């Protein structure tokens, strides 16, 4: 956590990385696209050098649950502006329950703080908890407004859980681009939008994610750290956004999005693992 804060002092200008470094990553992505009949988008940003590389990085993909990082960052921002109290409580009603609410479904009739709702949705991807946050913020449009405020002109949130995960081809609602969300994470974790305390809390939630052990975490190089948030949706949507770093490697922000495939969730997970392994190899070989 301290290491990440060191890099929050300066965000360098972005420059396109030498594509030869990522030749294997691109090759792997193309092979996976063909084998799964999928659409894949990738973006990678080195926060120290400002170098970035992308594959279909400006094309749109369903946000799915990767929006939860942004919603909770908005909660932190509003709290810092004195516009919301993260310790305020919301009574949980049975009507609040939606598909996949492992934390909230056990607390019907009880109260939960907004802070705890963010912890629940960030660490378990609890959908009812996400809706509690969205309602407190003023709805999905408030998240989109926040994104525009911090310079993201592409990412948009239009619906709540679980409808936002529809993933229909050509539907602009609830979408992002790999490049846009990498830039947004860079601003939220290393920029000036949030205080250092806010950045640390957002990172803490991402580091303690409990539902991504079979994705990038499974191929993380020894001695590296990761803070991430994943998502899944209709029409084969699968995604992950992550920050990875080590003592020798400055933070790297990665986004991987899959869409429009009939592949199983296991095969989509495996695709993310293979792409992640190739990305990590680029940086681990540099630091040897």
UniProtKB/Swiss-Prot annotation:
Keyword Lipid metabolism assigned: no
Record keywords: Antibiotic resistance, Disulfide bond, Hydrolase, Plasmid, Signal, Transposable element
Enzyme Commission code(s) on record: 3.5.2.6
Coiled coil: none
Position of the signal peptide: 1-17
Binding positions for substrate per the UniProt entry: 229-231
Molecular function as annotated in GO: beta-lactamase activity
InterPro entries for this protein: Beta-lactam/transpept-like, Beta-lactam_cat, Beta-lactam_class-A, Beta-lactam_class-A_AS
Activity control mechanisms: Inhibited by clavulanic acid and sulbactam.
Active-site residues annotated for this sequence: 65
GO BP terms in the entry: beta-lactam antibiotic catabolic process; response to antibiotic
Reactions catalysed, as given in the entry: a beta-lactam + H2O = a substituted beta-amino acid
PROSITE patterns linked: BETA_LACTAMASE_A
Disulfide bond annotation, renumbered to this chain: 72-118
Pfam families linked to this entry: Beta-lactamase2
Family to which the UniProt record says this protein belongs: Belongs to the class-A beta-lactamase family.
Functional summary from the UniProt entry: Hydrolyzes carbenicillin. Methicillin and oxacillin are weakly hydrolyzed.
Any further remark recorded for this protein: The class A beta-lactamase family has a specific amino-acid numbering system, sometimes called Ambler or ABL numbering and often misspelt as Amber. A multiple sequence alignment was used to derive a consensus sequence and then the consensus was numbered taking into account insertions and deletions. This allows use of identical numbers, e.g. for active site residues, despite differences in protein length. UniProt always uses natural numbering of residues, hence there appear to be differences in numbering between this entry and some papers.
Protein name: Beta-lactamase CARB-4
Gene assigned in the entry: carB4
């Amino acid at each position: 956590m301290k290491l990440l804060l060191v890099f929050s002092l300066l965000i360098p200008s972005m420059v396109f990385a030498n594509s030869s470094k990522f030749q294997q990553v691109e090759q792997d992505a193309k092979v996976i696209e063909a084998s799964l009949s999928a659409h894949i988008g990738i973006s990678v940003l080195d926060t120290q050098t400002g170098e970035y590389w992308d594959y279909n990085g400006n094309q749109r993909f369903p946000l799915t649950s990767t929006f939860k990082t942004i919603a909770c960052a908005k909660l932190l921002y509003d709290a810092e502006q004195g516009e919301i109290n993260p310790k305020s409580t919301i009574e949980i009603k049975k009507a609040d329950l939606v598909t996949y609410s492992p934390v909230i479904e056990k607390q019907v009739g009880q109260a939960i703080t907004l802070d705890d709702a963010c912890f629940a949705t960030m660490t378990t991807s609890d959908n009812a908890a996400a809706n509690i946050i969205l309602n407190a913020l003023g709805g999905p449009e408030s998240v989109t407004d926040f994104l525009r405020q911090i310079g993201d002109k592409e990412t948009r949130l239009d619906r709540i859980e679980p409808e936002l995960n529809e993933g229909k081809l050509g539907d602009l609602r609830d979408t992002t681009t790999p490049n846009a969300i990498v830039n947004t994470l860079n601003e939220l974790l290393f920029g000036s939008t949030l205080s250092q305390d806010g950045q640390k809390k957002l990172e803490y939630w991402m580091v303690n994610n409990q539902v991504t052990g079979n994705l990038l975490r499974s191929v993380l190089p020894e001695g590296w750290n990761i803070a991430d948030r994943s998502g899944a949706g209709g029409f084969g949507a699968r995604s992950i956004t992550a920050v990875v770093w080590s003592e020798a490697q400055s933070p790297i922000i990665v986004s991987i999005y899959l869409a429009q495939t009939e592949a199983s969730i296991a095969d989509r997970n495996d695709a993310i693992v293979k792409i992640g392994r190739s990305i990590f190899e680029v940086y681990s070989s540099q630091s040897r």
